[in-house]
């Protein structure tokens, strides 16, 4: 078998296992954890308003989001301390799967897997 074909089969196999491991039980726990209290909400408002909007008090809004309610934002702009790329990537998952724990974690799992695949291919290229 051709060495190039084998290397791609190994890369795809490792990438597939990595993706399955990342997606397995991704939605647990279903509540907002640590920085998730900021980024998924900012991504959701960017998806719907085009900019980061403000939300109500996290102690009342976060349980509502975990329960499936995603309309607690206001039209007021949020104070932004980070560039928008990460929130734009999170909004892809939210667009596909809704404002759910799986939705706001999906992009991180997908791009984390792509980094593994790219690292394998880069190592292969550099070590030939």
What are these regions (language model features)?
Residues 1-128:
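Membrane-integral, polyisoprenol-dependent glycosyltransferases
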């Amino acid at each position: 078998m051709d060495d190039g074909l084998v290397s791609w089969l190994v890369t795809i196999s490792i990438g597939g296992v990595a993706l399955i491991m990342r997606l397995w039980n991704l939605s647990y726990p279903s509540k907002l954890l640590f920085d998730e209290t900021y980024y998924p909400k900012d991504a959701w408002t960017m998806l719907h308003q085009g900019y980061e909007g403000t939300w109500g008090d996290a102690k009342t809004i976060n349980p509502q989001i975990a329960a499936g309610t995603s309309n607690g934002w206001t039209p007021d702009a949020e104070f932004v301390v980070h560039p928008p790329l990460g929130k734009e990537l999170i909004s892809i998952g939210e667009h596909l799967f809704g404002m759910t724990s799986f939705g706001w974690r999906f992009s991180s799992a997908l791009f984390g897997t792509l980094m593994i695949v790219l690292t394998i291919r880069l190592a292969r290229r550099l070590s030939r």
